[in-house]
């Protein structure tokens, strides 16, 4: 049986680990959060969905354990924040077999960075549609059940290979999983979706609450339209997400961002918070600079104005620095920042 390591025991990594363990695969979870690993070792990993709670005896290890055990893995599935990409993938490279496969189950655009650390020939890209949250050691809230969870996996070269099908087979234990010959386009499409929910991050609200605030839905659609425009200028072929088809996206035209936003808010359920909102609640750095910030950065290179994404980045900086507290009233600061950027 092939040996699998899930590197990163946050919400995504924990959900994936539980599902793969339940499927009977040879998998271990590795993380630097000592309390989480110790709790799992002692009491198992509890995953709660709308269908109930399930406790799974996941094999969990501290990162320091690997130095002693020196394991070699056929597959490493890395589920860490974008800002931890390079050092974590370098750490992982020591434990990946020569012809092993490294898959980044991450937001943002990290596959080329991962390739620099573990070798391009070892990397497969992935897109993740799985909403989940973790605030306490050993307990995960999974907002999308397996039937509503979706992955796409693709070779960086665009080829459909036997090893890609192996990764698909693994991920089918967690949710639906498609093969793509357009992983860069698929990754940008997910970045578009993430960019539209990042404006919620400083409001201390769940997604469905945030989107009901006056003007918030339209603001998020504005963010998405900019992200679509920049992606198109970069030459990325946009992929359908959230059960939408190419025909749905094509027929929507300029309203594609609005269509995606409506479908996304509907699918993730009433308890979901955007990943950036979870980070802010924990007092941690978010990935906004790697999502909306990436749109802004590429927009500047292309001469495309991105005031909506720029405003989201600026508000995130204010949150990170402690200049503003998490509160629904921050929507007014967000709108004011947008007005300033448009005037400039």
Residue ranges and their predicted role:
Residues 21, 41, 171-172, 232, ...:
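Anion (oxyanion) recognition and catalysis
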Residues 1-52:
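NAD(P)+-binding Rossmann beta1-loop-alpha1 motif at the extreme N-terminus of oxidoreductases
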Residues 2, 221-344:
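NAD(P)-dependent Rossmann-like dehydrogenase/reductase catalytic/cofactor-binding core
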Residues 94-95, 117-122, 137-244:
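Internal alpha-helical scaffold of NAD(P)-dependent oxidoreductase catalytic cores
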Residues 31, 51, 64, 106, ...:
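Residues at the C-termini of beta-strands that transition into short coil/loop
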Residues 54-141:
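Rossmann-like NAD(P)(H) cofactor-binding subdomain of soluble oxidoreductases
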């Amino acid at each position: 049986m092939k040996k699998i390591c899930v590197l990163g025991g946050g919400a995504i990594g924990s959900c994936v680990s539980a599902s793969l363990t339940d499927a009977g695969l040879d998998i271990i979870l590795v993380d630097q959060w000592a309390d989480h690993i110790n709790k799992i070792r002692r009491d198992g990993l509890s995953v709660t969905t709308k269908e109930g709670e399930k406790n799974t005896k996941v094999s969990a290890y501290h990162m320091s354990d690997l130095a002693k055990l020196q394991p070699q893995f056929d597959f490493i599935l890395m589920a860490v924040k974008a800002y931890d990409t390079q050092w974590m993938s370098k750490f992982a490279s020591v434990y990946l077999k020569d012809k092993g496969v490294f898959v980044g189950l991450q937001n943002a655009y990290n596959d080329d960075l991962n390739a620099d650390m573990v070798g391009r020939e070892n990397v497969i890209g992935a897109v993740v549609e799985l909403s989940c949250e973790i605030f306490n050691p050993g307990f995960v809230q999974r907002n999308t059940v397996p039937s509503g969870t979706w992955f796409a996996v693709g070779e960086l070269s665009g080829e459909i290979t036997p090893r890609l099908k192996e990764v698909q087979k693994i991920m089918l234990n967690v949710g639906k999983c498609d093969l793509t010959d357009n992983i860069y386009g698929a990754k940008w499409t997910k970045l578009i979706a993430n960019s539209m929910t990042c404006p919620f991050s400083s409001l201390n609200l769940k997604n469905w609450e945030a989107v009901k605030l006056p003007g918030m839905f339209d603001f998020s659609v504005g963010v998405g339209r900019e992200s679509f425009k920049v992606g198109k200028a970069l030459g990325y072929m946009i992929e359908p997400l959230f059960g939408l088809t190419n025909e749905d996206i094509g027929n929507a035209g300029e309203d594609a961002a609005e269509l995606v936003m409506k479908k996304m808010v509907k699918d993730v359920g009433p308890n979901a918070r955007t990943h950036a909102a979870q980070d802010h609640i924990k007092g941690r750095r978010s990935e906004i600079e790697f999502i909306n910030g990436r749109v802004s950065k590429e927009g500047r290179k292309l001469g495309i104005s991105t005031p909506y994404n720029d405003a989201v980045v600026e508000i995130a900086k204010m949150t990170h620095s402690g200049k503003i507290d998490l509160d629904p009233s921050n929507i007014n600061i967000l709108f004011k920042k947008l007005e300033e950027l448009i005037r400039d």
